[in-house]
Amino acid sequence: MDNFTKLYIQRCEPELAEFHFKRKRTTFVRVVNDVMQNFILEKLHGGRAYRVLFAVIPLCLPIEKTYISGGVYSYALRRFEIVRGTMAFDRWECNPKSNECIQACIESIMQFIRVHLMPFFECANCCRTALPELINLERRFNENRKASLQLAGIRDAAETDGVNLFDPVKYYMALKNGDYNFALKSRQVLERQNVYAYQDSMARGFLSPKSKLDRERAIQTLRKEIEYLQAGDTSYFHQLLLQNEAYSKENLKEIF
């Protein structure tokens, strides 16, 4: 563990004690109501830059043990604000040989955690509140990205509001909330993308017989879920969410 990481942990542990996070190496994690929240420090470019990634994951999405350590279904903390004067939109650049630079970088990260991350976590503390919070977050980050590019003299031609409909986190939150309209829209977008990718790979001859079968089964599963959503079959999804939540809680036992 390098000096930057040690100092960062020494700052985080006492300052975030009131929020009841558990630490696993460079990840801080907690479970609140029906969601898991975590954030992780990543070292980049041999210590010349650091990035903090955070996530809110519903327990009704089957949480693997690897998800606990962070970096899965995550967002970059730095994106809460518009970045000026650098193309490193998602990280803090740092001179690892300068103690003054290290301290300033850690102080900036801690300010982002206090001002942006903790208030966000407090609002997104269950599936019911986390889904709209994540949607608003993605839109905000998209606008910040465009503004950062503009400051760098780059025009963003992407026509999107930044909301990721492929995201399983929001899909499972929508199921838990009974928001079948959002869940249906999410699955339909994913099904179309899977069909396109399958047809393109077939045309290029990229798929082995096993890969072809796996892709076809995945598409059939999506279509089955779409049918259940269109029919409003709550019993199917109720059982699915119960099974997933039990699986997540079992995997979370190692830290809680």
Predicted feature descriptions by range:
Residues 1-4, 30-256:
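Intrinsically disordered, low-complexity regulatory regions enriched in serine/threonine/proline
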Residues 21-24, 45-47:
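Short, ordered beta-strand-loop transition motifs
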Residues 2-23:
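Amphipathic alpha-helical segments
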